[in-house]
Amino acid sequence: MYYELSHQKQKLFTMKKLFFLFICLILIQCQKSNPEKTSTRWSEEKIWNWYNNHPWLVGTNFITSSSINQLEFWQEETFDPELIEKELKLSASIGMNTHRVFLHDLLWEQDSIGFLDRIDKFLEISDRNGIKTLLVFFDDVWHPVPNMGKQPEPIPHVHNSGWVQSPGAKILYDSLSHNKLESYIKGVVTKFADDSRILAWDLYNEAGAEGIASHDISKERAIELYEKIGIEITDDNYSSYNLNDIDPKSIKKTYTLSLLKKTVEWVRESNPSQPITTGIYAWDIDWAPLSDLSELDQFIINSSDIISFHSYGSKKDVLERLKQLKNYNRPLLCTEYIARENKSTFEDVLPIFKENKIGAYNWGLVSGKTNTIYPWKSWDSTYTAPPNKWHHDIFYQNGEPFSNDEIELIKNLTSQANK
């Protein structure tokens, strides 16, 4: 009897999933056959009107302290509404009103209905705490071989040892596989296209990223690090951990640009009421004039309704970046900052963002399994205890701040801006 009921339940779930995917395909076909419903890049007037109707936007790149990566955050078995509520309340208590949150294509592939339900639940909790959400679809940073199921334990004292790319290298480096992602993008955007709880859509984090710390370690260092979480690397299996070979930076931008172009089309065809963006981030180039940028960066700027960027540099660097980006005459969001040892601090940077009404999303809220209190160099330098200056993050898990002075500064700036 138990087997029969279980079998019937599984059959019903499969039928529901197939029905939902069928509806998505109908919507996709309707959009393709009705080109007048396809949106285009927002005009400068439209995006400025939209932006000026919002308060100063301040928040974090949010993930619960119990999650090592996007998959652990969103999977049904580890999705934790109570902890989300607790940690979002903490951010709201210091005046934060928005968060940037990463999705993953594998979550859609495994259980699209459940994934959408969990996104909806997250948005419900966020809205209850006065927080709007910037959702991120794809990410070119950290581990290129994501897998569903139980996620690895953090490598002790190592920055972001479990974060995963989306899509993984298997799909990214096979252009013919890119179209498999269309239902993911259109399914999510169509579901929430008119949802005021979503601030905007961030299509691709650090598109074409190179120089990732996890990729540049030696074989000996890889053996040492992975041994700490019970993974033995040998000559026979090293190819599975040689990330530079799996994720070759020499050709990555070509494949990323191909996927990003398709993603922009898919989102525009879904005609969301929210604007879209993809961030510019390369630290070793100027970001203007446009003609000097790579083909990928030119496309990023030209396809974004609102310009977003990452800045982990000093006050001087931020001011120079703002000068360059103001050439594009669109509102600005800094979607990643804070690297205290790198002179990217709340004290130096956040007042600049407030003065210029630039949206500000620091990396990390509550210190946890991502280990982002440790710097990037922890991949190649041994730490045995937390650094005196945290790299990212604001709070301990008990709700105590890393720095009382930082908390007072954030509170003062957000309260002044939103009077």
Where are the predicted features?
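N-terminal secretory signal peptides that target proteins for export/translocation
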Residues: 1-15
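Sec-dependent signal peptide recognition
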Residues: 16-21
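C-terminal motif of bacterial Sec signal peptides marking the signal peptidase cleavage site
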Residues: 28-29
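Active-site mouth of glycoside hydrolases
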Residues: 37-304, 315-317, 328, 337, ...
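Catalytic His-Asp charge-relay segment
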Residues: 331-333
